[in-house]
Structure formats: structure tokens, C-alpha cells
Amino acid sequence: MSKLISYAAKNTLRNTRLGANPICQHATRDYMHLAAASAARNTYSTPAVGFAKQPVLRQAVNTVAVMGQISRRSMFIQTQDTPNPESLKFLPGVDVLGKGNTYDFPSGSAAHCSPLAKLLFRVEGVRAVFFGGDFITISKEESGEWGLIKPEVFAVIMDFFASGLPVIHEARPNADTEILEDDDETVMMIKELLDTRIRPTVQEDGGDIVFMGYENGIVKLKMQGSCSSCPSSIVTLKNGVQNMLQFYIPEVESVEQVFDDADKMANKEFERFEKSLMQKESVNQPNAPVNIGGGTPN
């Protein structure tokens, strides 16, 4: 948030836009390559176990495993905390989607185009997955424990990148900030500022921000990744994003966070869980002393 405010005070609006390069193309034989990477490290992630152990394919798997071993030796995955305690940022040391590109997977059903996302959702306790230029943000269930989830995520990431498979099967630029023919000057400036100043800063915290619309001076944005359920997301929007947009674009009056059906359901469940905790605490608290005499207690 402080970075956004300092940017607003020091920087001028750039007129150049980040180009979106194709991320990858369709890949074949996903599981064979993944099994080979698993064989290289002598452990098998869930989808690779059955495949790699088939006798007919053993020779092919072991042949490719040498390449997987070489790739894995050079991979060192780091983790970084995010403002959201339920989300953790994983830095594999290699490009995930490439600079400026992001992809949000709020649930396993949205991971149809990404072999890596599918594998990560198979880790018990993983609630959501988010890909950035050079990082992966994992959001866990409230009941999940990072001590159990992190080793599994490490194994999946190592296996996957050693296999050489594409992260997603289709290129996907940031369509929300693509300049359209019917965009007026204000909308164009908002999209430009989001892409060049705001989005990179939010991505540093393992999340992303998506432009949803502009009407009557109100900019509508959707938070993704670690920012989607972060307790400080409203503060970030109001004190960081809104201040910067208003600094450069006087037409902007306010910023509103947009929630989809999945977000609303998650927030409702969280409120219900929080309410049940408060009720349990009130039941467990000892009763206050009763003043039988009616006078002022000592």
C-alpha cells in the first residue's frame, strides 16, 4: 500500500503499454513427462504414480528422467508471506507465466486449461491457485496447515517444471486492460495506470487486480490471488489504489471492490464461522460475579 502511495507522488503516467507475449502452446504426453520428472527424484506425485510404474513405459520414463534430474538440480523454491495469512507465495526461480501475465484459479473447476493448477488442487487443503509472472500463490482452507501443505506443493512444482510442460495450454493476456475502440479517454488512462503502476505492485504481494468497469466516476475492481480474501484488501483499495487513480485522473471519485458469486459465498461462510466462534467464546467465559446485596461491589 505504501508503495502505491509513493508511486503516486513520484511518478508520471507512462504512455507505453506492456506487451503480452504468447505464454505457451498445447502440449502432449503430459503425464509421461511428469512421470519422468518424478522418476528423476525417486518420488512420485499422485498423477504420476500409476503412469510411471507401467512396465511398458518404464524404459521411456527412465530415458527422459535424466533430463528431469538436471532441471531439478537447478531449482530452488522460495516462499514469501503475503498480507493474507491464508495465502503463501511460492517463487520457483523460473518464469511461470512471464512478466505482466496472471491467471486466477478460484476453484479446481477453473483449472481445466492448466496441468500445473490441476495438480496443485489435488493437494489436500488447497482452496485456490494463482499464477503470476514468476510466482505461484496458494490459498489454503481455514482448517489446512502450511506444515502439511507446503511439502506437497514443493513436490508438485519441482516435478512439473522438471517435466518441461507448459503451465497453461492457451495464451491469455490481460484482457481486462486491453484498449477497446469504444473506450473513452478516462477509461484508457485507468487501464494504462492499472497495467503500468498498480498491477505490478499488487502482484508483489501474490495477487492481482482486475478492471471490471467505470461508471459515473466510480472504478470497479476485483481482487484476485492472495488479495481476494485479504483482511486489508479494502484498505489497499482505498488508501493505495484510489489515491493513485485520483492523483493522475481527477475524474475518478472512488473505487469499489466487486465480488462474484464465489467470493460472496466464501465471505458468507467466513462470517458464519466467525459468528460460531464468538458464540462458543461467550459460552466458555465465566459468569460475571453477582452482587446479591444490591450495593456497589468492592
From Swiss-Prot:
Chloroplast keyword on record: no
Keywords associated with the record: Iron, Iron-sulfur, Metal-binding, Mitochondrion, Transit peptide
Top-level lineage group: Eukaryota
Region (NifU): 190-258
Localization in the cell: Mitochondrion
Region called Disordered, residue ranges: 279-298
Chief subcellular location: mitochondrion
A molecular function (GO) term: iron-sulfur cluster binding
SUPFAM superfamilies assigned: Fe-S cluster assembly (FSCA) domain-like, Hypothetical protein SAV1430
Pfam families in the record: Nfu_N, NifU
SMART domains for this protein: Nfu_N (SM00932)
InterPro entries, alphabetized: FSCA_dom_sf, Nfu/NifU_N, Nfu/NifU_N_sf, NIF_FeS_clus_asmbl_NifU_C
Segments of skewed composition (Polar residues): 279-288
GO biological process assignments: iron-sulfur cluster assembly
Binding residue positions for [4Fe-4S] cluster: C227, C230
Gene Ontology CC: one annotated term: mitochondrion
Matching Gene3D superfamilies: Fe-S cluster assembly (FSCA), Scaffold protein Nfu/NifU, N-terminal domain
General function of this protein: Molecular scaffold for [Fe-S] cluster assembly of mitochondrial iron-sulfur proteins.
Family of this protein: Belongs to the NifU family.
Name this protein carries in UniProt: NFU1 iron-sulfur cluster scaffold homolog, mitochondrial
Origin species: Drosophila virilis (Fruit fly)
Higher taxonomy: Eukaryota, Metazoa, Ecdysozoa, Arthropoda, Hexapoda
